[in-house]
Amino acid sequence: MNAAVILIIGIVILALGYVFYGGWLSKQWGIDPSRTTPAHELEDGMDYCPAKAPVLMGHHFSSIAGAGPINGPIQAAVFGWVPVLLWVLIGGIFFVGVHDYGALFASVRNNGQSIGTVVESSIGQKAKRLFIIFSYLTLILVVAAFASIVANTFKATYLESGAVDVAKSAANATTAIISLLFIVLAIFFGFFVYRRNAPLGVSTLIGVVAIAMIMWLGIKWHPIYLSYQTWMIICGIYILVASVTPVWILLQPRDYLSSFLLYAMMLLALIGVVGAHPSLDMPAFTGFVDTVAPTGSSLGYMFPALFVTIACGAISGFHSLVGSGTTAKQLNNEKDAQPIAYGGMLIECVLALVSLCAVAYIWERYKTGEVVTPTVVFATGLSEMLGKVFGAGAVNVTYTLMVLAVSVFCLTSLDTATRLARYMFQEFWLKPGEKVSDPTVTGARKVLCNPYVSTAITVVLGIALGMTGYAKIWPLFGAANQLLAGLGLLAVAAWLGKMGRNNKMFIFPMIFMILVTLTSLVFTIKAQIVGIIAGGQGVAWFYIRGILAVLLVILAIDLVIEGGKAIASNSKKAEQA
């Protein structure tokens, strides 16, 4: 099968899904362009700030994309290209499109508050607190992981003498200096667009040219060689400042400009796949159990592994936090919700399909373990395709661009996750209907709701975990993230039912994702029990992971029972009305 044909057919199906299913959802939910959004009604110049649709699309897309739609499809390719293709297309249109769009819509109709507040209004305060605790701890893990990824991407390599190995450190130093200069560029862009009213089109053109100049400068001049620990501290300081800075200064302009790197990467990828039109030299289906195991560790059974491994690109709970966190507070008009939330997610699905084509192109090297790191697989496959289109000289240049783009998005996801965690932490202490600025928020609650205090607590926890043992509990993240997706679907379904609107499009995806995550957690608990019985060094981590997995199962069951009652009650009221 030709990879270009698969990619083109996939794009057409996703586009049809956006037009017909996305349009149907807008009608079912009652999207109202004349309704004032929280970005205008509650504008404070800090978190609530209306953004033009292209700018907000840049923020939303940069925040949800990251490395997820690259890593997941490549790792899940061990089951064959057909299961990956089907899950990306079906999951994109009927699962994550509904999930992301619904979370944003529900948040906008609840004053831009997070999905936790939606849980409170539709299920109850106890459910809200449980949901926020779970979401906050998941975000702390995300902060730890992405800070560590960024620090590893930037760090220098040292010789035994203690001196910097410049040859081995040059690529990381290049990425570091480009990323830092990118932040400076974003601040200037935000200042001129928002404070000097510079035309967005002209500013964008200048910004894109400046990005190219920064990349050239970074390749030629990279004087920063710092250790992993130093970069972790710098990341901590950066997200501490970035997460309490008004969104127009850094978050909006940086994510908007960052999105052009991703667009450029995707455009080159499409040119590479269509231009080289390679055959898919990998099995269509390998079986219901991972027997390829290129990393030496099998993913296990296709159910639930496929649906947990491919998160971004099919459905990811993190997206509901972004949509109901930062994006909802910047939405200029309700009519922008479909292209940003539903459309942005389907673009991410295209990136997932491109990732599948990349791993298929170098399948023999991947399955033998010669090239296994997803980012390297992605960059290698696509750069070699582009080499066939533009000549051998394009391979190294495009490889560097691919790796750099992924690194930039890890940084954008990092400070977005920190800001989201701050929102969650603040909302946890609020009573029903309260806002952080209300005079009723006093004493310890006022201190804990202070943005600087809540951000500092989040950053300290995240960076400390990143510098110690986050990798030991990271295996739980996949199931936790997909459980968050299932609970997000549950929350919006309950809220729509309470509002008297059609919520049936949420029921099957919700049930399916909760079954997937519970099955995955049961397998995880079983593996930890086996590890505990075997004993040996590191047995304490088997206990920790096992306990956390059991707690996640209990949390899921509790919230499902509470949410199920709310949905059933609302359905009964609707029938009686």
Language-model segments: residues:
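Extracellular loop-to-transmembrane helix junctions
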Residues: N2-V19, A76-S107, G116, T174-F182, ...
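Juxtamembrane transmembrane-helix boundary signature
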Residues: A15-P38, H60, I90-G116, Y194, ...
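Membrane-interface "cap" regions at the ends of multi-pass membrane proteins
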Residues: L16-I70, S259, Y301, A305, ...
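Membrane-interface helix-loop-helix modules in multi-pass membrane proteins
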Residues: C49-N110, S121-Q125, T138, V142-Y158, ...
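Membrane-helix boundary/coupling elements in multi-pass transport proteins
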Residues: A67-I74, G91-H99, A103, S107-N111, ...
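Loop-to-transmembrane helix boundary motifs in multi-pass membrane proteins
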Residues: Q125-I140, G343-V350, G393-T398, E427-M467
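Hydrophobic alpha-helical segments and their helix-loop junctions in multi-pass secondary transporters
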Residues: Y194-R195, V209-I233, V241-S243, Y263-T291, ...
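Extracellular/periplasmic helix-exit of transmembrane alpha-helices
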Residues: V273-T291, L346-G381, T416
